[in-house]
């Protein structure tokens, strides 16, 4: 007879182990890996307790990760570490999200207003240097704008306004060609450029700069390789 503790341990392993598959509509020879939202962990800011303002909701359509920022909280970023054997293989990232509360006047293209209802970041690393593309669902920033560019010895980062405004509570699907995006933003459009390891995916909702509430749900993260 299997003990209750053994059953719980087995369930945790099953839930945290990503399972590759090929989805209908994906080109032959490519596989899809679902990233379980239960496996996202705090990577910036507080790491435990009520200060971590994210939790998993077991919704009828599947699990989702919900973030609800309140003024006065320290900003927390959640992250998923990509398995080492896939870091050079990933072609696309897919997910769905819905805004639940827009930070008042949040505008990532203006200093001091850079709060987002939701963001998804893709991180590559070569040696000590990080390359980050942050895709945001903004309150009011112009759709398609690229803002908050940073270029230092250890960090290259761009923020892309992927969605702006709109109704709350409405799911939107997203697809990003991550290899093409790296080439366009960090390699001057050189299709032959060497792409560093894609090491992680992050997400965040925040309202610390505008001192306002913000919130979002994320679900159905997948990488295509």
PLM region spans:
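Extracellular/lumenal carbohydrate-interaction signature centered on repeated Trp-anchored short motifs
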Residues: 80-93, 165-168, 194
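Extracellular beta-strand ligand-recognition surfaces/modules
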Residues: 112-120, 152-154, 161-164, 168-215
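Solvent-exposed strand-to-loop "edge" motifs in beta-rich extracellular domains
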Residues: 96-102, 125, 179
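Bacterial N-terminal signal peptides
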Residues: 8-18
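Extracellular beta-strand elements of beta-rich domains used
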Residues: 201, 219-223
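Short carbohydrate-recognition loop motifs
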Residues: 55-75
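Extracellular/luminal beta-rich ligand-recognition
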Residues: 113-156
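Extracellular carbohydrate-recognition regions
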Residues: 24-48
């Amino acid at each position: 007879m299997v003990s209750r503790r053994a059953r719980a341990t087995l369930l945790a392993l099953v839930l945290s182990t990503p399972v590759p598959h090929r989805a209908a509509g994906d080109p032959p020879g490519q596989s899809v890996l679902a990233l379980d939202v239960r496996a996202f962990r705090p990577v910036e800011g507080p790491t435990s307790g009520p200060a971590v303002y994210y939790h998993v909701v077991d919704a009828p359509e599947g699990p989702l990760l919900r973030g609800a920022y309140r003024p006065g909280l320290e900003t927390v970023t959640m992250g998923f570490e990509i398995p080492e054997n896939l870091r050079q293989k990933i072609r696309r990232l897919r997910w769905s999200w819905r805004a639940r509360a827009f930070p008042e006047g949040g505008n990532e293209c203006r200093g001091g207003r850079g709060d987002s209802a939701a963001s998804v970041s893709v991180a590559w690393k070569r040696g000590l240097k990080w390359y980050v593309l942050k895709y945001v669902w903004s309150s009011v920033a112009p759709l398609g704008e690229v803002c908050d560019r940073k270029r230092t010895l250890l960090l290259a980062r761009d923020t892309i306004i992927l969605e702006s405004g709109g109704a709350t509570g409405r799911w939107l699907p997203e697809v990003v060609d991550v290899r093409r995006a790296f080439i366009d933003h960090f390699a001057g459009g050189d299709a032959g450029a060497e792409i560093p390891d894609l090491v992680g995916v992050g997400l965040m909702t925040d309202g610390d700069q505008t001192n306002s509430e913000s919130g979002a749900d994320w679900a159905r993260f997948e990488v295509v390789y």
